[in-house]
Amino acid sequence: MEKTFAMISLGCAKNLVNSEQMLYLMSEAGYTLVPDPEGADLAIVNTCGFIDAAKSEAIDNILEMAQLKKAGKLGGLIVTGCLAERYKDSIMSEMPEIDAVLGVGSFGEIVSAADAVMTGRCTSAFGDNSAPVDEIPRVVSTGPGWAYLRIAEGCNNFCAFCAIPFIRGRYRSRDMENIIEEARDLAAHGVKELIVIAQDITRYGTDLYGKRCLAELCRRLSEIDGIEWIRLHYLYVDQFDEELIDEIANNPKIVKYLDIPIQHINDHILKIMNRRGTGEDIRVLFKKLRERIPGLVIRTSLIAGLPGEGEAEFEELCEFLKEARIERVGVFPFSPEEGTPAAKMEHVDEEEAQRRADLIMELQATIMDEFCQGFCGKTIRVLCEGYDEEAGMLYGRSYADSPDIDGQVFFKGSCRDGDMTSVRILEADDGILYGEEI
Protein backbone atom coordinates (compact mmCIF):
# COMPACT_ATOMS: atom_id res chain seq x y z
CA MET A 1 0.00 0.00 0.00
CA GLU A 2 1.34 3.43 -0.98
CA LYS A 3 2.56 5.66 1.85
CA THR A 4 2.21 9.36 1.03
CA PHE A 5 3.57 12.54 2.57
CA ALA A 6 3.49 16.28 1.93
CA MET A 7 6.40 18.61 2.70
CA ILE A 8 6.06 22.24 3.78
CA SER A 9 9.45 23.97 3.88
CA LEU A 10 9.64 27.36 5.58
CA GLY A 11 12.42 29.86 6.16
CA CYS A 12 15.83 30.23 4.62
CA ALA A 13 17.75 28.45 1.87
CA LYS A 14 19.75 26.50 4.45
CA ASN A 15 16.51 25.08 5.83
CA LEU A 16 15.40 24.22 2.29
CA VAL A 17 18.52 22.07 1.90
CA ASN A 18 17.45 20.14 5.02
CA SER A 19 14.00 19.69 3.47
CA GLU A 20 15.60 18.35 0.30
CA GLN A 21 17.61 15.87 2.37
CA MET A 22 14.43 14.64 4.05
CA LEU A 23 12.76 14.32 0.64
CA TYR A 24 15.58 12.01 -0.41
CA LEU A 25 15.43 9.87 2.73
CA MET A 26 11.65 9.54 2.58
CA SER A 27 11.62 8.61 -1.10
CA GLU A 28 14.37 6.04 -0.57
CA ALA A 29 12.27 4.50 2.21
CA GLY A 30 9.30 4.04 -0.11
CA TYR A 31 7.24 7.11 0.77
CA THR A 32 5.64 9.06 -2.09
CA LEU A 33 5.65 12.86 -2.10
CA VAL A 34 2.28 14.48 -2.87
CA PRO A 35 1.68 18.20 -3.52
CA ASP A 36 -1.32 18.58 -1.20
CA PRO A 37 -1.35 17.53 2.47
CA GLU A 38 -5.09 16.95 2.32
CA GLY A 39 -5.51 13.20 2.00
CA ALA A 40 -1.84 12.43 2.73
CA ASP A 41 -0.69 9.92 5.32
CA LEU A 42 1.80 12.42 6.72
CA ALA A 43 2.66 16.10 6.60
CA ILE A 44 6.16 17.32 7.45
CA VAL A 45 6.47 20.99 8.39
CA ASN A 46 10.12 22.06 8.37
CA THR A 47 10.04 25.27 10.35
CA CYS A 48 11.96 28.50 10.80
CA GLY A 49 12.21 29.97 14.29
CA PHE A 50 14.45 32.96 13.71
CA ILE A 51 12.22 36.03 14.15
CA ASP A 52 8.65 36.60 15.32
CA ALA A 53 7.21 36.72 11.81
CA ALA A 54 8.86 33.41 10.93
CA LYS A 55 7.64 31.80 14.16
CA SER A 56 4.11 33.00 13.47
CA GLU A 57 4.23 31.58 9.94
CA ALA A 58 5.46 28.25 11.28
CA ILE A 59 2.76 28.07 13.95
CA ASP A 60 0.06 29.00 11.42
CA ASN A 61 1.18 26.16 9.14
CA ILE A 62 1.30 23.68 12.01
CA LEU A 63 -2.20 24.67 13.13
CA GLU A 64 -3.50 24.39 9.57
CA MET A 65 -2.15 20.84 9.38
CA ALA A 66 -3.62 20.10 12.81
CA GLN A 67 -7.06 21.14 11.54
CA LEU A 68 -6.72 18.78 8.58
CA LYS A 69 -5.75 16.00 10.96
CA LYS A 70 -8.68 16.74 13.27
CA ALA A 71 -11.05 16.64 10.28
CA GLY A 72 -9.72 13.22 9.29
CA LYS A 73 -8.09 14.58 6.13
CA LEU A 74 -4.48 14.01 7.23
CA GLY A 75 -2.91 11.03 8.93
CA GLY A 76 0.00 12.33 10.99
CA LEU A 77 1.92 15.54 11.62
CA ILE A 78 5.71 15.81 11.94
CA VAL A 79 7.40 19.11 12.84
CA THR A 80 11.10 19.63 12.21
CA GLY A 81 13.64 22.45 12.05
CA CYS A 82 14.46 25.59 13.99
CA LEU A 83 11.13 26.15 15.77
CA ALA A 84 11.17 22.53 16.91
CA GLU A 85 14.74 22.91 18.18
CA ARG A 86 14.12 26.24 19.88
CA TYR A 87 11.07 25.02 21.79
CA LYS A 88 11.99 21.36 22.14
CA ASP A 89 11.02 21.26 25.82
CA SER A 90 7.46 22.44 25.26
CA ILE A 91 6.33 22.18 21.65
CA MET A 92 4.63 18.77 21.90
CA SER A 93 2.86 19.57 25.17
CA GLU A 94 1.66 22.93 23.88
CA MET A 95 0.61 21.52 20.50
CA PRO A 96 -0.57 17.95 21.22
CA GLU A 97 -1.75 17.54 17.62
CA ILE A 98 1.92 17.04 16.67
CA ASP A 99 2.90 13.38 16.42
CA ALA A 100 6.67 13.71 16.04
CA VAL A 101 9.30 16.41 16.49
CA LEU A 102 12.85 16.47 15.12
CA GLY A 103 15.44 19.11 16.00
CA VAL A 104 18.07 20.53 13.67
CA GLY A 105 20.53 17.76 14.51
CA SER A 106 18.07 14.99 13.71
CA PHE A 107 16.90 15.44 10.12
CA GLY A 108 18.46 12.05 9.39
CA GLU A 109 15.88 10.45 11.70
CA ILE A 110 12.94 11.46 9.52
CA VAL A 111 12.16 7.95 8.26
CA SER A 112 12.20 6.50 11.77
CA ALA A 113 9.86 9.27 12.89
CA ALA A 114 7.56 8.70 9.90
CA ASP A 115 7.44 4.95 10.49
CA ALA A 116 6.61 5.54 14.15
CA VAL A 117 3.77 7.92 13.33
CA MET A 118 2.41 5.51 10.72
CA THR A 119 2.06 2.89 13.48
CA GLY A 120 0.39 5.28 15.90
CA ARG A 121 3.40 6.18 18.06
CA CYS A 122 4.57 9.65 19.03
CA THR A 123 8.30 10.34 19.00
CA SER A 124 10.90 13.08 19.23
CA ALA A 125 14.63 13.35 18.56
CA PHE A 126 17.10 16.15 19.20
CA GLY A 127 20.62 15.41 18.06
CA ASP A 128 23.89 17.07 18.93
CA ASN A 129 24.00 20.43 17.14
CA SER A 130 27.76 20.56 17.64
CA ALA A 131 28.38 17.29 15.77
CA PRO A 132 29.92 17.24 12.26
CA VAL A 133 27.49 18.07 9.47
CA ASP A 134 25.48 15.06 8.29
CA GLU A 135 26.31 14.14 4.70
CA ILE A 136 22.85 13.26 3.40
CA PRO A 137 21.97 13.20 -0.32
CA ARG A 138 19.11 15.43 -1.41
CA VAL A 139 16.35 15.81 -3.97
CA VAL A 140 16.93 19.25 -5.49
CA SER A 141 13.67 21.21 -5.51
CA THR A 142 14.98 24.45 -7.01
CA GLY A 143 15.95 25.35 -10.54
CA PRO A 144 15.84 24.82 -13.40
CA GLY A 145 19.56 25.25 -13.85
CA TRP A 146 20.53 26.26 -10.31
CA ALA A 147 20.85 24.83 -6.83
CA TYR A 148 21.99 25.81 -3.37
CA LEU A 149 25.28 24.36 -2.15
CA ARG A 150 25.55 24.48 1.63
CA ILE A 151 29.16 24.39 2.81
CA ALA A 152 28.80 24.74 6.60
CA GLU A 153 26.34 24.59 9.47
CA GLY A 154 25.95 26.80 12.54
CA CYS A 155 27.54 30.12 13.42
CA ASN A 156 30.26 31.46 15.72
CA ASN A 157 29.47 35.16 15.42
CA PHE A 158 27.00 35.48 18.31
CA CYS A 159 25.52 38.80 17.22
CA ALA A 160 23.51 40.24 20.10
CA PHE A 161 20.22 40.21 18.16
CA CYS A 162 20.49 36.70 16.70
CA ALA A 163 19.47 33.30 18.06
CA ILE A 164 20.99 31.20 15.27
CA PRO A 165 24.10 30.02 17.21
CA PHE A 166 21.84 28.82 20.02
CA ILE A 167 19.52 27.01 17.60
CA ARG A 168 21.92 25.69 14.95
CA GLY A 169 25.04 25.35 17.09
CA ARG A 170 28.64 26.40 16.56
CA TYR A 171 30.19 26.71 13.10
CA ARG A 172 31.04 23.38 11.42
CA SER A 173 32.50 23.28 7.91
CA ARG A 174 31.72 20.41 5.58
CA ASP A 175 34.60 18.37 4.24
CA MET A 176 35.76 19.96 0.99
CA GLU A 177 35.84 16.67 -0.92
CA ASN A 178 32.20 16.01 -0.02
CA ILE A 179 31.24 19.47 -1.24
CA ILE A 180 33.08 18.98 -4.54
CA GLU A 181 31.46 15.57 -5.02
CA GLU A 182 28.01 17.06 -4.46
CA ALA A 183 28.74 19.93 -6.87
CA ARG A 184 29.85 17.48 -9.56
CA ASP A 185 26.62 15.54 -9.14
CA LEU A 186 24.58 18.73 -9.40
CA ALA A 187 26.43 19.71 -12.59
CA ALA A 188 25.82 16.24 -14.04
CA HIS A 189 22.09 16.83 -13.52
CA GLY A 190 22.05 20.13 -15.40
CA VAL A 191 22.87 22.65 -12.70
CA LYS A 192 24.77 25.62 -14.14
CA GLU A 193 24.63 27.99 -11.15
CA LEU A 194 25.80 27.03 -7.67
CA ILE A 195 24.61 29.34 -4.91
CA VAL A 196 27.11 28.80 -2.11
CA ILE A 197 25.47 29.27 1.29
CA ALA A 198 26.14 29.09 5.01
CA GLN A 199 25.52 31.46 7.86
CA ASP A 200 29.05 32.79 7.21
CA ILE A 201 30.84 31.35 4.17
CA THR A 202 33.95 33.50 4.68
CA ARG A 203 34.75 31.43 7.78
CA TYR A 204 34.70 28.19 5.77
CA GLY A 205 37.55 25.83 6.66
CA THR A 206 38.77 27.56 9.81
CA ASP A 207 37.50 24.77 12.04
CA LEU A 208 38.45 21.81 9.81
CA TYR A 209 41.66 23.00 8.19
CA GLY A 210 42.86 25.77 10.50
CA LYS A 211 42.59 28.46 7.82
CA ARG A 212 40.09 30.21 5.58
CA CYS A 213 39.47 28.01 2.54
CA LEU A 214 36.67 29.73 0.61
CA ALA A 215 39.01 30.93 -2.15
CA GLU A 216 40.39 27.41 -2.62
CA LEU A 217 36.89 25.94 -2.61
CA CYS A 218 35.76 28.42 -5.28
CA ARG A 219 38.76 27.54 -7.45
CA ARG A 220 37.90 23.86 -7.29
CA LEU A 221 34.20 24.44 -7.92
CA SER A 222 35.06 26.50 -10.99
CA GLU A 223 36.98 23.54 -12.45
CA ILE A 224 33.80 21.44 -12.64
CA ASP A 225 32.51 21.03 -16.20
CA GLY A 226 29.05 22.50 -16.67
CA ILE A 227 29.22 24.99 -13.82
CA GLU A 228 29.05 28.52 -15.25
CA TRP A 229 28.11 30.68 -12.27
CA ILE A 230 29.19 30.52 -8.62
CA ARG A 231 27.22 32.93 -6.42
CA LEU A 232 28.34 33.70 -2.87
CA HIS A 233 26.00 34.20 0.13
CA TYR A 234 26.79 35.34 2.99
CA LEU A 235 30.19 36.97 3.55
CA TYR A 236 31.31 38.82 6.66
CA VAL A 237 33.35 42.02 6.59
CA ASP A 238 35.96 40.90 9.14
CA GLN A 239 36.69 37.60 7.36
CA PHE A 240 37.69 38.93 3.91
CA ASP A 241 41.33 38.43 2.93
CA GLU A 242 43.39 39.32 -0.15
CA GLU A 243 43.33 35.76 -1.49
CA LEU A 244 39.53 35.73 -1.52
CA ILE A 245 39.26 39.16 -3.15
CA ASP A 246 41.76 38.12 -5.84
CA GLU A 247 39.82 34.91 -6.51
CA ILE A 248 36.52 36.75 -6.87
CA ALA A 249 38.10 39.38 -9.12
CA ASN A 250 39.96 36.96 -11.40
CA ASN A 251 37.75 33.87 -11.55
CA PRO A 252 35.26 34.37 -14.42
CA LYS A 253 32.86 31.78 -12.99
CA ILE A 254 32.34 33.67 -9.74
CA VAL A 255 29.53 36.10 -10.49
CA LYS A 256 30.35 39.66 -9.54
CA TYR A 257 27.65 39.72 -6.87
CA LEU A 258 28.43 39.50 -3.17
CA ASP A 259 25.96 39.25 -0.31
CA ILE A 260 27.62 40.96 2.66
CA PRO A 261 25.18 41.55 5.56
CA ILE A 262 26.30 44.60 7.56
CA GLN A 263 23.10 45.31 9.59
CA HIS A 264 24.22 48.90 10.41
CA ILE A 265 27.01 51.42 9.87
CA ASN A 266 27.13 53.25 13.22
CA ASP A 267 30.09 52.24 15.39
CA HIS A 268 28.21 52.33 18.69
CA ILE A 269 25.42 50.11 17.40
CA LEU A 270 27.85 47.69 15.76
CA LYS A 271 29.68 47.37 19.08
CA ILE A 272 26.67 46.76 21.31
CA MET A 273 25.27 44.31 18.74
CA ASN A 274 28.59 42.42 18.93
CA ARG A 275 29.29 42.91 15.23
CA ARG A 276 32.97 42.56 14.42
CA GLY A 277 34.57 45.61 12.82
CA THR A 278 33.58 49.25 12.54
CA GLY A 279 31.72 51.45 10.11
CA GLU A 280 35.05 52.51 8.66
CA ASP A 281 35.99 48.86 8.10
CA ILE A 282 32.80 48.46 6.07
CA ARG A 283 33.47 51.60 4.02
CA VAL A 284 37.08 50.60 3.33
CA LEU A 285 36.12 47.05 2.29
CA PHE A 286 33.33 48.19 -0.03
CA LYS A 287 35.65 50.74 -1.66
CA LYS A 288 38.36 48.11 -2.14
CA LEU A 289 35.91 45.58 -3.58
CA ARG A 290 34.55 48.08 -6.11
CA GLU A 291 38.07 49.09 -7.16
CA ARG A 292 39.22 45.50 -7.60
CA ILE A 293 36.03 44.00 -9.06
CA PRO A 294 34.57 46.12 -11.89
CA GLY A 295 30.79 45.86 -12.23
CA LEU A 296 30.38 44.41 -8.74
CA VAL A 297 26.86 44.19 -7.34
CA ILE A 298 26.68 44.28 -3.55
CA ARG A 299 23.70 42.99 -1.59
CA THR A 300 23.38 43.65 2.12
CA SER A 301 20.83 43.35 4.88
CA LEU A 302 20.02 46.00 7.46
CA ILE A 303 18.03 46.17 10.68
CA ALA A 304 16.10 49.34 11.45
CA GLY A 305 15.36 50.26 15.05
CA LEU A 306 18.18 48.31 16.68
CA PRO A 307 18.88 49.02 20.36
CA GLY A 308 20.88 52.24 20.54
CA GLU A 309 19.51 53.63 17.27
CA GLY A 310 18.31 57.20 17.73
CA GLU A 311 17.58 59.69 14.98
CA ALA A 312 21.28 60.54 14.58
CA GLU A 313 22.31 56.90 14.15
CA PHE A 314 19.46 56.29 11.71
CA GLU A 315 20.43 59.37 9.70
CA GLU A 316 24.02 58.12 9.56
CA LEU A 317 22.77 54.85 8.08
CA CYS A 318 20.70 56.69 5.46
CA GLU A 319 23.64 58.93 4.51
CA PHE A 320 25.83 55.86 4.13
CA LEU A 321 23.34 54.30 1.73
CA LYS A 322 23.27 57.48 -0.36
CA GLU A 323 27.07 57.45 -0.56
CA ALA A 324 27.67 53.71 -1.00
CA ARG A 325 24.95 53.19 -3.68
CA ILE A 326 24.49 49.56 -2.68
CA GLU A 327 22.59 47.86 -5.48
CA ARG A 328 20.56 45.34 -3.45
CA VAL A 329 19.31 45.89 0.10
CA GLY A 330 16.97 43.96 2.36
CA VAL A 331 15.82 45.74 5.52
CA PHE A 332 13.95 44.41 8.52
CA PRO A 333 12.51 46.21 11.54
CA PHE A 334 14.20 45.06 14.74
CA SER A 335 12.50 42.05 16.32
CA PRO A 336 13.61 41.29 19.90
CA GLU A 337 14.40 37.58 20.04
CA GLU A 338 13.92 35.86 23.37
CA GLY A 339 17.13 34.56 24.86
CA THR A 340 19.35 37.06 23.03
CA PRO A 341 21.18 39.98 24.70
CA ALA A 342 19.45 42.52 22.44
CA ALA A 343 16.02 41.45 23.67
CA LYS A 344 16.90 42.88 27.08
CA MET A 345 18.07 46.22 25.69
CA GLU A 346 15.97 49.34 25.27
CA HIS A 347 14.87 49.91 21.68
CA VAL A 348 12.39 51.93 19.67
CA ASP A 349 8.82 50.71 19.47
CA GLU A 350 7.64 48.42 16.70
CA GLU A 351 5.81 51.15 14.78
CA GLU A 352 8.86 53.43 14.72
CA ALA A 353 11.16 50.58 13.67
CA GLN A 354 8.80 49.81 10.77
CA ARG A 355 8.68 53.50 9.80
CA ARG A 356 12.46 53.61 9.60
CA ALA A 357 12.58 50.39 7.60
CA ASP A 358 10.05 51.85 5.14
CA LEU A 359 12.12 55.03 4.77
CA ILE A 360 15.22 52.99 3.96
CA MET A 361 13.34 51.05 1.30
CA GLU A 362 12.04 54.29 -0.25
CA LEU A 363 15.59 55.58 -0.45
CA GLN A 364 16.86 52.28 -1.77
CA ALA A 365 14.17 52.09 -4.47
CA THR A 366 15.67 55.18 -6.12
CA ILE A 367 19.18 53.71 -5.98
CA MET A 368 17.99 50.38 -7.36
CA ASP A 369 16.09 52.06 -10.19
CA GLU A 370 19.20 53.99 -11.24
CA PHE A 371 21.18 50.76 -11.20
CA CYS A 372 18.64 48.88 -13.31
CA GLN A 373 18.34 51.70 -15.84
CA GLY A 374 22.08 51.32 -16.40
CA PHE A 375 21.47 47.95 -18.07
CA CYS A 376 19.40 49.46 -20.90
CA GLY A 377 21.15 49.03 -24.24
CA LYS A 378 23.55 46.41 -22.84
CA THR A 379 23.72 42.69 -23.55
CA ILE A 380 23.94 40.42 -20.51
CA ARG A 381 23.95 36.69 -19.77
CA VAL A 382 20.70 35.34 -18.35
CA LEU A 383 19.82 31.97 -16.83
CA CYS A 384 16.40 31.09 -18.27
CA GLU A 385 13.97 29.81 -15.63
CA GLY A 386 10.68 29.50 -17.47
CA TYR A 387 7.88 31.03 -19.52
CA ASP A 388 5.37 33.52 -18.10
CA GLU A 389 1.97 32.95 -19.70
CA GLU A 390 0.57 36.31 -18.65
CA ALA A 391 3.54 38.30 -19.94
CA GLY A 392 3.99 36.09 -22.99
CA MET A 393 7.74 36.07 -22.37
CA LEU A 394 10.53 33.94 -21.06
CA TYR A 395 12.03 34.97 -17.74
CA GLY A 396 15.24 34.38 -15.85
CA ARG A 397 17.98 36.03 -13.83
CA SER A 398 21.15 37.95 -14.57
CA TYR A 399 24.35 37.92 -12.54
CA ALA A 400 22.84 40.77 -10.51
CA ASP A 401 19.86 38.71 -9.35
CA SER A 402 19.73 36.00 -6.72
CA PRO A 403 16.57 33.83 -6.59
CA ASP A 404 13.53 35.08 -4.66
CA ILE A 405 15.19 38.20 -3.23
CA ASP A 406 16.22 40.24 -6.30
CA GLY A 407 14.81 41.11 -9.70
CA GLN A 408 14.18 39.16 -12.90
CA VAL A 409 14.75 39.54 -16.61
CA PHE A 410 11.79 39.07 -18.98
CA PHE A 411 12.68 38.54 -22.61
CA LYS A 412 11.50 37.30 -25.98
CA GLY A 413 13.39 34.30 -27.27
CA SER A 414 13.43 30.55 -27.77
CA CYS A 415 15.90 29.09 -25.27
CA ARG A 416 15.01 26.24 -22.94
CA ASP A 417 14.49 26.33 -19.19
CA GLY A 418 17.83 26.02 -17.43
CA ASP A 419 19.84 27.34 -20.39
CA MET A 420 22.18 30.32 -20.32
CA THR A 421 21.56 32.85 -23.07
CA SER A 422 22.45 36.41 -24.07
CA VAL A 423 19.77 39.09 -23.78
CA ARG A 424 19.84 42.68 -24.98
CA ILE A 425 18.11 44.86 -22.39
CA LEU A 426 15.62 47.32 -23.84
CA GLU A 427 13.77 48.59 -20.77
CA ALA A 428 13.88 48.62 -16.97
CA ASP A 429 10.87 49.13 -14.72
CA ASP A 430 10.57 48.72 -10.94
CA GLY A 431 13.60 46.47 -10.67
CA ILE A 432 12.60 44.25 -13.61
CA LEU A 433 14.55 44.19 -16.87
CA TYR A 434 12.97 43.57 -20.28
CA GLY A 435 14.78 42.56 -23.44
CA GLU A 436 15.23 40.16 -26.32
CA GLU A 437 17.43 37.14 -26.84
CA ILE A 438 20.22 37.61 -29.37
Q: Which residue stretches match the model-derived regions?
A:
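Proteins enriched for Cys/Gly/acidic motifs involved in redox and nucleic-acid/cofactor modification
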Residues: 1-204, 243, 258, 281-291, ...
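Conserved, mostly hydrophobic/aromatic
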Residues: 159, 179, 196, 232, ...
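Structural recognition of alpha->loop->beta junctions
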Residues: 93-108, 215-227, 250-255, 316-328, ...
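Conserved SAM/AdoMet-binding glycine-rich loop
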Residues: 77-81, 86, 188-312, 322
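Generic beta-strand/beta-sheet core signal
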Residues: 8, 197-199, 233-235, 261-263, ...
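Short, hinge-like loop/turn segments at secondary-structure boundaries
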Residues: 95-96, 117-120, 212-214, 248-250, ...
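Terminal RNA-binding accessory module
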Residues: 336, 344-438
